[in-house]
Amino acid sequence: ALGQWIEERCLLAKSHREGVSELFADWREWAERAGEYVGSVKRFSELMAARKFEKCRLTGGARGITGIALRPKPYSHGYPYRDD
């Protein structure tokens, strides 16, 4: 399931860096929709490390992962700022 999420939702390049919390939040949303086991942030980080993604520190000290970034989300609601 993690491989499918990476394929569908992520971009891979050595220069990419993304926060662990952002990646995990997207993974959780995707996994819940797909009926997959979400697990913990720790487990997620371990699975990413097993796939040879390296940990890094982002500006401000936040934990990140190198070599991966989230794809921009498509607008699913048509008008995200529509004033009803």
Which residue stretches match the model-derived regions?
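Phosphate-handling catalytic cores of nucleic-acid transaction enzymes
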Residues: 1-4
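Positively charged interface segments
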Residues: 7-84
